[in-house]
C-alpha cells in the first residue's frame, strides 16, 4: 500500500522504498480536468454585468459579411448559430460563469485566411474574439456580446523540430498534449505542463503566458519562446519565427504578445525551446502541521534536491476533503488527516543519483519533525494517483455548483494568509455553511516555488452578494502585500477593472497606448484586459 512506502524502522530513522517509473509515464501525468458543471444554468454575461455596454463602434454582422467569409472560407470553416446549434461550446467559458451571444465562429485553416478575416473585420469594424482551446479561467476567450469568434483549432500542424537544439516550431492551434507527445518521441519535453493540456492550445498558453507546474524548473514562457508569427488587427502578418536563442538586434517584439491575451494581435505560430526529457521521475506526497512548515520543507527541498526538483505544490486540508469527495474509489494516500499537504516531483538523468538525494532529503525532514507523514510512488500508477489529489482540486471545487477562482502571486510568508482572511470575511457575511447557505468554503493550493496561490471559493450558486463580498476585497488584500492580482491565468474580463491593484497608473497608460497604437479600432478581444 502507498502508506507503507515510507516505513519507520528504528527511532527516528526512515527507510526509503520508492522506485522510479519509466520515462514514458510522463505522458499521463496531468489529465485534463473535463468536468463541466450542469448545476448552474449559465446566464449571459451582459445580463450579469448590466453596467458593461456594447461598444457602439462595432458593426453587427450582416448577410454581406457572411457572404464575404463564405468567399474565402470553406463550408467546414464556418459555424453559424441555428435552432439546433447555439454555439454554446464557443460562447461559454469552462466554469459556466461567462456566456456570450456570438452567432458566428470562423475556423480558418491557414494563416493567410486569418489575415483576410482580420483585414476585413478591421475595415468593417467587426469585433473579434480569438479563441484557442477555451480553457481559460477569467472570461478572456469567450465573447461578452455578439463578437465574431475566430477559432485557431484548424491551425494544428507541427511545422518543424530540430532534434539537436530541441527547438519546436508549430501552429498556434496545436494542442499542448500533442506537442508534448511529439517531442517526447524524440527525447525532449515541452517546458510547460497544465491540467488542461488535453484541450488547451500552444498559442493560447503563450497568449496568456500560462505558468503551470514546471515553472519552478524551467521558468516562464518569456524565456522559452524564441519567436512568434502574429497577425495584426489590420491583417498584416508579422513573421518572427526565429530559432536563435541569442538575438540582440533591437526591441524584443515577441514579448509584447506573450501574455497579451489576443488584444493587440493573434498568435498563429510559435517557435519554442523544448527541454531534454528526464530519465528518472519520482513523486512524494507529504503532510505538515502548518504553512510555516510548508515553507521550511520548501527551503530544504531547494537546498537538498536542488537541480532535480521539478515541482513543489501545496494543498490545504479543505482542498483534499473536496478532492476526496470526487475520488470516491481512491484510498487517501495517508492514514490521518493533516492541516497541509505537499506534493514534490523530482526529475533527472541519473536514477541512482536522484534516489540518493531524495532519500537523504526525506530522512532529514522527517527526523527533524518538519514532515509528519508521507508516501513515495513506487510505480507509474501510484505516481499518477498521487498527482490526482492535486489535479482533482479544480474539478472538486466546482462540484457543488460553481466556483470563484482567484489566481494571485504573494510573498511566500503571506501566501496562505489570503485564504484565512477570505474564510473569515465570508463567515462574517454569514454566507458559509450547509445548504441553503450559498458558499461551501474557501480553499487554498498552489505552486510554492513561484509564490502562486490558487484561492478557490466553492459555491452552490453564483450571486452578486458573494461577488461583492469577495471583490475587491481579494485584490485589495493582494495589493496590501505587494502581490499580483494575476499570477498565471491573465486578466480577461474578470480582472480588467483591477489591474490598478498591481500596476501603476503610468504602466496602465503605457499598456493602453500600445493597444490604441496596434489596434486603433479596438476590434481585438474588446471589453477585456485593460
From Swiss-Prot:
Catalytic activity, reaction form: (R)-lactate + 2 Fe(III)-[cytochrome c] = 2 Fe(II)-[cytochrome c] + pyruvate + 2 H(+); (R)-2-hydroxyglutarate + pyruvate = (R)-lactate + 2-oxoglutarate
Pfam families: FAD-oxidase_C, FAD_binding_4
Subcellular location: Mitochondrion matrix
Gene3D superfamilies in the cross-refs: 3.30.465.10, 3.30.70.2190, 3.30.70.2740, Uridine Diphospho-n-acetylenolpyruvylglucosamine Reductase, domain 2, Vanillyl-alcohol Oxidase, Chain A, domain 4
The enzyme's E.C. designation: 1.1.99.40, 1.1.2.4
Entry function: Catalyzes the reversible oxidation of (R)-2-hydroxyglutarate to 2-oxoglutarate coupled to reduction of pyruvate to (R)-lactate. Can also use oxaloacetate as electron acceptor instead of pyruvate producing (R)-malate. In addition to its enzymatic role it could play an important role in the yeast cell morphology.
Subunit (UniProt): Interacts with F-actin.
Additional note from the record: Present with 11400 molecules/cell in log phase SD medium.
Entry similarity comment: Belongs to the FAD-binding oxidoreductase/transferase type 4 family.
Designated name of the protein: D-2-hydroxyglutarate--pyruvate transhydrogenase DLD2
